[in-house]
Amino acid sequence: LLLVLKTGKVSFFQLRLKKYSLKNKILIGKKIKRICKNYNVKLIINDDPFLTKILNADGCHLGQNDINILEAKKIIKNKIIGITCHNSIRLARIAIKNKADYLAFGAFFPTRTKNAKYTATTKVLNTVKKLTKTPLIAIGGINNLNYKNLLLNKANFLAISSYIWNNKKYKPLEAIKKIR
């Protein structure tokens, strides 16, 4: 993680600890937060505004089955809140109305990180970009061979997981260096 963040190519790090106890989430979260802070990387907690508050993380990412954004704002106040919109312009409009700080769309490509029920297209990114200045995040199966098209089609940020952390061909540092 240190070497990857040291490259300066990571603006946000999302911590996903679905199968851990709260105690372990806090222990791991504190260590990750310190590393992120050292490299000016914002720490985003997946699905859990309570953990976001406990860790005083920079923000929280909410899926469609997580706590409502308005409830999350009561818990974490002015922290960053991003919303998964899958491939839906309707969900994006709701998130925009509720003042989400970013909108995440995907999966754009097959992914091993989680079971993707939805496939997003660059058409969705282009359509939503006309509706808002809210940053758009592309997620799902992104790698060194397919990322440029997403950036050309209005994605402000890329959420990349398996390509960096579970790559059979490249170590994390090698993988991230291939994303220019």
What do the predicted segments below correspond to?
Residues F12-I75:
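N-terminal active-site wall of soluble small-molecule enzyme domains
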Residues F12-Q14, I44, H61, G82, ...:
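Conserved beta-strand positions in the central sheet of alpha/beta enzyme cores
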Residues L3-R16, N98:
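Catalytic domains of carbohydrate-active enzymes, especially glycoside hydrolases
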Residues L62-A72, A104-A116, Y147-I179:
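Glycine-rich phosphate-binding active-site loops on the catalytic face of alpha/beta enzymes
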Residues L17, Q64, C85-N87, A107-F108, ...:
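Short secondary-structure boundary segments
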